[in-house]
């Protein structure tokens, strides 16, 4: 190892150890914090049924027509969806609503104008999965795990706003909903609530669409505790 003599000029290369001064600050805390989420077995949860819950629009074309009309009146649509996770044999599973044989979606929906995102998601979760006996469900919502934008009145959505888009037509936010140790869910009769393992969702946009199939990556930052 070479050593710079004490009388040598410090203008050449390599320079002394003080070249960068305080440019690089010593990190006193880790750059990332470990976020721990408790998961409970699917068998801890009870699933009942309630009256059917129908979509506002009868077709995809009708949905985009209503979106266009509302955009002219109130601007961009805001949508929130909840990601509920359980485990089976220490493998994380996401609860999905299944309509028919091939359509899956996360519980959630449209926010009212000016409605708070978290409070709106709690309202929607109660409407979709809330129990019928009047006991209020305690939805714990702390983490936003994803943002998706719809640039036009068309099906494609992206996890970013395309560069040429100044007025997205819809903004969808995904939130992790932490479940209690035990709970009762009432599922609308026209839906099935299914538990899909992460390995089934991963890289499976043809089966579940781009948003649901991205959940394994979005959830990988959490440290799951299997109770």
From Swiss-Prot:
Q: Where is this region: Necessary for interactions with PAPOLA and PABPN1?
A: 81-160
Q: Give the tissue specificity.
A: Expressed in testis. Expressed in male germ cells (at protein level).
- List Omega-N-methylarginine occurrences by residue: 15
Give the start-end ranges of region Interaction with RNA.
102-104
Region span, Necessary for RNA-binding: 2-147
**Which GO annotations describe the biological process of this protein?**
cell differentiation; co-transcriptional mRNA 3'-end processing, cleavage and polyadenylation pathway; mRNA 3'-end processing; mRNA alternative polyadenylation; mRNA processing; positive regulation of pro-B cell differentiation; positive regulation of stem cell differentiation; post-transcriptional regulation of gene expression
| N6-acetyllysine modification, residue list | 23, 29, 56
Post-translational modification N-acetylserine, affected residues: 2
* Top-rank taxon: Eukaryota
Q: What is its main location?
A: nucleus
Identify the residue span(s) of motif Nudix box: 109-130
GO terms, molecular function: chromatin binding; histone deacetylase binding; identical protein binding; mRNA 3'-UTR AU-rich region binding; mRNA binding; protein homodimerization activity
Q: Which InterPro entries match?
A: Cleav_polyA_spec_factor_su5, NUDIX_hydrolase-like_dom_sf, NUDIX_hydrolase_dom
- PROSITE patterns named in the record: NUDIX (PS51462)
Task: Write down the position(s) of the site called Interaction with RNA.
Answer: 55, 63
Summarizing the function annotation, the protein's role is:
Component of the cleavage factor Im (CFIm) complex that functions as an activator of the pre-mRNA 3'-end cleavage and polyadenylation processing required for the maturation of pre-mRNA into functional mRNAs. CFIm contributes to the recruitment of multiprotein complexes on specific sequences on the pre-mRNA 3'-end, so called cleavage and polyadenylation signals (pA signals). Most pre-mRNAs contain multiple pA signals, resulting in alternative cleavage and polyadenylation (APA) producing mRNAs with variable 3'-end formation.
Task: Provide the assembly information.
Answer: Homodimer (via N- and C-terminus); binds RNA as homodimer. Component of the cleavage factor Im (CFIm) complex which is a heterotetramer composed of two subunits of NUDT21/CPSF5 and two subunits of CPSF6 or CPSF7 or a heterodimer of CPSF6 and CPSF7. The cleavage factor Im (CFIm) complex associates with the CPSF and CSTF complexes to promote the assembly of the core mRNA 3'-processing machinery. Interacts with CPSF6 (via the RRM domain); this interaction is direct and enhances binding to RNA. Interacts with CPSF7. Interacts with FIP1L1; this interaction occurs in a RNA sequence-specific manner.
PANTHER family in UniProt = PRE-MRNA CLEAVAGE FACTOR IM, 25KD SUBUNIT
This chain's protein is named: Cleavage and polyadenylation specificity factor subunit 5
- In the UniProt record, what gene is named as encoding this protein? Nudt21
């Amino acid at each position: 190892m070479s050593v710079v003599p004490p009388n040598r000029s410090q203008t050449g290369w390599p320079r002394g150890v003080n070249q960068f001064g305080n440019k690089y600050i010593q990190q006193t805390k880790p750059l990332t914090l470990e976020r721990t989420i408790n998961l409970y077995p699917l068998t801890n949860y009870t699933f009942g049924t309630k009256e059917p819950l129908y979509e506002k629009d009868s077709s995809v074309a009708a949905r985009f027509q209503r979106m266009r009309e509302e955009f002219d009146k109130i601007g961009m649509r805001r949508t929130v969806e909840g990601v509920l996770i359980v485990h089976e044999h220490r493998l994380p599973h996401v609860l999905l609503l299944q309509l028919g044989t091939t359509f899956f979606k996360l519980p959630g929906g449209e926010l009212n104008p000016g409605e708070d995102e978290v409070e709106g998601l709690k309202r929607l979760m109660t409407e979709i999965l809330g129990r019928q006996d009047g006991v209020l469900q305690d939805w714990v919502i702390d983490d936003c795990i994803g943002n998706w934008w719809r640039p036009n009145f068309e099906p494609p959505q992206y996890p970013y706003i395309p560069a040429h888009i100044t007025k997205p037509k819809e903004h969808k936010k995904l939130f992790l909903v932490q479940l209690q140790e035990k709970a009762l869910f009432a599922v609308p009769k026209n839906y099935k609530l299914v538990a899909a393992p992460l390995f089934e969702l991963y890289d499976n946009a043809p089966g579940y669409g781009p948003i649901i199939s991205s959940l394994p990556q979005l959830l990988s930052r959490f440290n799951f505790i299997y109770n």
